[in-house]
């Protein structure tokens, strides 16, 4: 549920206008209530996928709901889902892609500060999280602020996982982390 919902793409390129994000019947209560009625004990929201579009009004990018027509850019999908999870007493988790096909600095050292700032926002502003999910992210082709090029990284070293994971441990000590780099749950290659 992101700009891709409105562009009919599996993965966005990062050049999608926030203006395409215009859900007309979004109802966090209905989504979480349905999950709870189905017997689920937790829900993980994809807060930002590889296209870089943020479902919360991040202070660090313009590529987010704050520049969409949805509720005049004044609302926050992450907050609504988080609040509904609290109401229905089911765990709330976040998915944050390390790869960002929209950001001009992706693949360079400066991007890490941006990524960690977003991780800090998500791990401090939405209550207790039961899981933080980092997808595998090797880079690839993308918009990258208009560069429209291929960028590859060494996923084992680029994200400096030891220090990045420390943000989660400090802000959400009880959260389980999923990523290719561990430490709690790793991808086993069966997607």
Protein language model features and the residues they cover:
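Mature catalytic domains of secreted/periplasmic carbohydrate-active enzymes
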Residues: 1-191
